[in-house]
UniProtKB/Swiss-Prot annotation:
Classification via InterPro entries: Ribosomal_bL27, Ribosomal_bL27_CS
Keyword Transmembrane helix: no
Record organism: Mycobacterium leprae (strain TN)
Database matches in SUPFAM superfamilies: Ribosomal L27 protein-like (SSF110324)
GO BP of this protein: translation
PANTHER family xref list: LARGE RIBOSOMAL SUBUNIT PROTEIN BL27M, RIBOSOMAL PROTEIN L27
MF term (GO), any: structural constituent of ribosome
Stored HAMAP family: Ribosomal_bL27
Transmembrane region(s): none
Protein name per the record: Large ribosomal subunit protein bL27
Cysteine pairings via disulfide bonds: none
NCBIfam families for this protein: L27
Amino acid sequence: MAHKKGASSSRNGRDSAAQRLGVKRFGGQVVKAGEILVRQRGTKFHPGVNVGRGGDDTLFATSAGAVEFGVKRGRKTVNIVAVGLTAD
């Protein structure tokens, strides 16, 4: 049986859906525990204080607070800092 298809057929024409990676919460934004901060492949950003890392390297907040980006030992890190409540 021939392995060539008939005329006017193509094996192309498919494309994969985008993975929607990137920073989801930016510096200074207030987040709740469990919110996703960064979707990534590999550790482009490393988890810092109050930040966890999922099995697919996603960074998420482990407590409520404000997002803070920084550098520690030459690595980009993401931290969650407590937001001070002001009494008016």
